[in-house]
Amino acid sequence: MKPFWEDEYLNKEKSTFGNPSKEVKELVPYLKKDAKILDVGCGDGRHALYLAGLGFQVDAFDLSKNAIEKIDYLKQKNNLNIHTWICDVLDYPFRYSYDLIIVHGVLQFIDKTKQPQVIELLKKWTNVNG
């Protein structure tokens, strides 16, 4: 049985999970203007789209093809620069160190035996002052 959000992602005009989270919005004043941000398990992009709209460099990935297709549609429509991938966190093609990595509502869906490996990868991908 597929998760409910797979069908929700097909509606390209409505955010599946609403506005960006309060926690992500609160981090914005602490970011450099040229901050590099990674959104892990980005869903339909509520955080990636918001942050790219503020001018940050954003990479985002999710397992869901529907989610990434929705982000790609919205980034084109709004002329935003977001690099997207359809992949698992363990298969992400690491590009560079990030100032901020968002993992919002994702860890609980990762196999518990793989969570320590994922945490180590996230630490490795984060800048020293990130």
Q: Where are the model-predicted features located?
A:
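Conserved SAM-binding strand-loop segment of SAM-dependent methyltransferases
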Residues: 78-89
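Conserved SAM-binding loop
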Residues: 71-72
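A conserved beta-strand element that flanks and buttresses the S-adenosyl-L-methionine
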Residues: 102
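Conserved SAM-binding motif I beta-strand of class I
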Residues: 57-62
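Conserved class I S-adenosyl-L-methionine
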Residues: 1-32, 34-43
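A short glycine-rich, Lys/Arg-flanked "PGG" loop and its adjoining helix->strand segment in the class I
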Residues: 116-128
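Conserved SAM/SAH-binding beta-strand->alpha-helix loop
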Residues: 64-66
